[in-house]
UniProtKB/Swiss-Prot annotation:
Bridged cysteine pairs (disulfide): none
Record flagged with keyword Heme: no
SMART domains the record matches: MUTSac, MUTSd
Name recorded for this polypeptide: DNA mismatch repair protein MutS
One term under GO cellular component: cytosol
NCBIfam families: mutS1, PRK05399.1
Length: 860
């Protein structure tokens, strides 16, 4: 440290040294100042003017507007350390200063920094002693959870990072560098903790102290299996950065992985469950279609349901029963949704109360939400709705909370505590509000007593209140008047009564603020004692919101209740893609398609041209199956769905430049994951596997994958391909499907309907033509196609000579499709020739020659 720095700058450098990874907001008077590198970075990110003092770069923001600047930095994934100033304990030194909190993207609780429909997660990953675990917390809702990894660690971790989309991650330094590329950790704000900080004994002690338990078994852990280290990392991080904001974390939820369908990260992305792959917003996702929830808690729960489909038929049917009840009683559902629209985010509000970060509005919003609770209770009781999670004691506590807020918190904008709740507050407020009246009353009393008609009471800051008497009345001044100042034409006086009155008025203002805050804090502490029941209300509202939303959408979109079974089957009659149908509404009618997969016929190969609807058919099947598992009605006329332990969706791929992986390698990695982890109870969706390499290589790989799924995994599968040769496979569980096409003259009409037969042509040249490929290229492609189709053994390479392949099946259909393609190309060539004839600029003789040429072309 430089020896010539000022005491304040030395103080700054000492504090900054403890918060190297944060931008330090250093309080100086009414500003937060930034210095050195923080000033350089802060001025650039916040658009502030950069200045210098004694060659030290600096910039600052006013304290009263600092929230806006902090928000900007948080949105840019920066940490902000807030350093406040206190008293000057050393006359020769600077004011006392300390960091009161470190605000970072993963631990924000201010509603202005949050989205109401998305949880804001901080996660910690621990690999201590090879006990892998993943802990997560949304501090704004106080929910801390942990997932224990006992196998397939990396696949599950990828899944959960995608599922929780954390704002911030805590890992060991060793873990970070080992898995940086495998998990693409550089996408996130990562806190790298020294490996020595990972200690089982310290973790146990810290968790026991925080949760006030004698043994971690009370939290559901075995102390000799230190999975809990990841939860310790979160508790320790919050404790060090947010001081006293741990009170709201009162339990750890241990997730049971086996209760939920496995959706790996690739499947979540490819099915666009909660965000699209274009701008990563929720628009055009399944969530955007299903989200017509009325409450923030309901929106967040819906997102959780979509990412965690249930596997237990009883639990699914319980949820479906509630949806069906509300669907059959749609008037009840609509009234309930009206009530829910008056419910506020009490899950986050009660967390703010627990962390002592509340404002008056929070109490009024709780009260308004409790009013909605009583209305909802009465409505549901009238219709005998079966879902109720409260006992008599809960209901008494809820009424107590409502009564407390109703009688204590003022609705008036300039008052905190309601009149009548506290006598002393009423007295002080009455003095404050009527100060001028008291002064006027006393002035009138002294005027009458002294007979001085011009007597006045004035006030100046340095002297306070005083009487003012002009020269002509000096002789009438009462004896109890105490002279305080003489001017040219007037004298100023005080009285003991005036001094007492002034003191009462001044004290009333100061004491009122302090007493109101004291009483306000007391009310908050009384409500916090009932935080468990308030969180219960939040959970109740969230669930009722989601099931009433499902009921409303089922009625609106003509969804049906699915039947869940333990059989290996997916039978969907006239199913639709929920997202495509939603966004096409009013533009084009969606083409319905059926799906029939059972224990005997479980592998469907789908062929046909691009643009015909193969990918839509694949995705809609997966989405309908998933919707059934979350307890929603589904877009179909009938749906029978066998419980599906995992959905794998390999559709589309792009290269990963940062990892040096080509599109083909990415595709093979995804395929390898499916083949390693799928079971016979899974659903596999694969599209165009084998592209990106040579035709023979791709065909060989695709065939081998189909064979492996059929013979070894035996999972329900939909496999779309342009390798038409695969349609000749013969297997008892193999079904050929294709996209129906209608020919109208020289045009192809894609009907987007699925039929049970192979398509042996992709009509690629036709698709290229309507896409606008230059005609010269199209003509050349036709020539090359004729050459290729004249070769022998084009469609059946030598390695397809096994007994599982039937070469002759579909050969006639193949020839028919090829013949049509060639005829279409000849027609287009002739059409192009005729269209170039300029009839206004040819002689009769030239016309005869052209006609002869046209006749010759039609014959050949």
């Amino acid at each position: 440290m430089r020896k010539d720095v000022t005491p304040m700058m030395r103080q700054y450098l000492n504090i900054k040294d403890k918060h190297k990874d944060a931008i330090l907001f250093f309080r100086v008077g009414s500003f937060y100042e930034m210095f050195f590198d923080d000033a350089l970075e802060g001025s650039k990110l916040l658009g502030l003017t950069l200045t210098k003092r004694e060659n030290v770069p600096m910039c600052g923001v006013p304290c009263h507007t600092s929230k806006d600047y902090i928000k900007k930095l948080i949105l840019l994934d920066k940490k902000v350390a807030i350093c406040e100033q206190g008293l000057q304990t050393d006359p020769k030194g600077p004011l006392e200063r300390e960091v009161v909190e470190v605000i970072s993207p993963g631990v924000v609780i201010d509603e202005d920094f949050l989205q109401d429909d998305i949880n804001n997660y901080l996660i910690a990953i621990s690999d201590y002693k090879d006990y892998y675990s993943f802990s997560y917390i949304d501090l704004s809702t106080s929910r801390l959870g942990i997932i224990l990894y006992e196998g397939n660690f990396l696949e599950k971790l990828r899944r959960d990072i995608e599922k929780y989309s954390p704002k911030e991650i805590i890992v060991s330094e060793d873990f970070y560098y080992e898995y940086l590329e495998k998990l693409a950790l550089d996408r996130f704000l990562v806190n790298k903790i020294p490996h020595w900080h990972f200690d089982k004994e310290i973790a146990m002690k810290s968790l026991k102290e925080h949760f006030n338990v004698l043994s971690l078994s009370a939290l559901g852990f075995k102390e000799d299996e230190p999975y809990y280290v990841s939860s310790f990392l979160i508790i320790d991080y919050i404790k060090n950065n947010l001081k006293n904001l741990l009170i709201n974390i009162d339990t750890i939820h241990i997730n049971n992985d086996s209760e939920y369908m496995f959706l790996d990260d690739v499947t979540q992305i490819n099915l666009e469950l909660v965000k699209n792959n274009n701008d990563l917003t929720s628009c055009y996702s399944l969530y955007s279609v299903l989200n017509d929830c009325k409450t923030p808690m309901g929106k967040r729960l819906l997102r959780e349901y979509i990412l965690n489909p249930l596997l237990d038929i009883v639990a699914i049917n319980n949820r479906l029963d509630h949806v069906e009840f509300l669907n059959n009683n749609i008037n009840l559902s609509m009234k309930l949704r009206d009530i829910l629209s008056n419910v506020w985010d009490i899950e986050r509000i009660i967390s703010r109360l627990q962390m002592k970060k509340y404002v008056k509005k929070d109490f009024l919003l709780i009260k308004e939400s409790l009013t909605a609770f009583f209305l909802a209770k009465r409505l549901l009781n009238e219709h005998s709705f079966s879902y109720w999670i409260f006992d008599v004691n809960d209901e008494n506590n809820i009424r107590e909370i409502y009564s407390l807020i109703d009688c204590s918190i003022s609705k008036e904008p300039d008052e905190l505590i309601q009149h009548g709740y506290n006598f002393e507050i009423d007295r002080l407020r009455e003095i404050k509000n009527n100060a001028s009246k008291y002064v006027d009353d006393y002035l009138n009393f002294e005027r009458n007593f002294s007979k001085i008609s011009s007597l006045k009471i004035r006030r100046i800051n340095v002297r306070g209140l005083f009487f003012e008497v002009t020269k002509s009345y000096y002789g009438q001044v009462p004896s109890h008047f105490i002279e305080s100042q003489t001017l040219n034409s007037v004298k100023r006086y005080k009285t003991n009564k005036l001094i007492e009155l002034e003191r009462d008025i001044n004290d009333a203002e100061d004491n009122l603020l302090a007493l109101e805050q004291e009483v306000f804090d007391d009310i908050a502490s009384k409500i916090v004692k009932h935080s468990v029941v308030i969180k219960k209300i939040a959970n109740f509202f969230a669930y009722v919101d989601v099931v009433s939303d499902f009921a409303y959408l089922a009625k609106k979109n003509e969804y049906v209740r699915p039947t869940l079974t333990n059989n290996k089957e997916i039978i969907l009659e006239c199913s639709r893609h929920p997202v495509v149908e939603h966004y096409m509404k009013g533009v084009e009618a969606f083409t319905k398609n059926s799906v029939k997969i059972d224990n005997d016929k479980y592998f469907c190969l789908i062929t046909g041209p691009n643009m015909a609807g193969k990918s839509t058919y694949l995705r809609q099947t997966a989405l309908v199956v998933l919707m059934g598992h979350i307890g929603s009605f589904v877009p179909a006329n009938q749906a029978i769905i066998g419980i599906t332990d995992k959905i794998f969706c390999r559709i589309g791929a792009s290269d990963n430049i940062s990892k040096g992986e080509s599109t083909f390698l990415v595709e093979m990695n995804e395929t390898a994951n499916i083949l390693r982890n799928a079971t016979q109870n899974s659903l596999i969706i694969m599209d165009e596997v084998g592209r990106g390499t040579s035709t023979n290589d791709g065909l060989a790989i695709a065939y081998s994958i189909v064979e492996y799924i059929l013979e070894h995994i035996q999972a329900r599968s939909l496999f779309a391909t342009h390798f038409h040769e695969l349609s000749a496979i013969k297997h008892d569980s193999f079904v050929n499907l294709s996209m129906k096409i209608e020919r109208q003259g020289d045009e192809l009409i894609f009907l987007r309907e699925v039929e049970e037969k192979p398509s042996l042509n992709s009509y690629g040249i036709y698709v290229a033509r309507i896409a606008g490929i230059p005609l010269k290229v199209i003509e050349r492609a036709n020539v090359i196609l004729k050459s290729l189709t004249s070769r022998e053994h084009l469609y059946v390479p030598e390695f397809f000579t096994s007994a599982t392949l039937v070469i002759n099946d579909g050969e006639e259909a193949m020839k028919e499709d090829l013949s049509y393609e060639l005829e279409l190309n000849d027609y287009l060539e002739l059409k192009n020739f005729i269209s170039k004839i300029d009839v206004n600029n040819i002689t009769p003789f030239q016309a005869m020659n052209l006609l002869s040429e046209i006749i010759l072309k039609t014959k050949t």
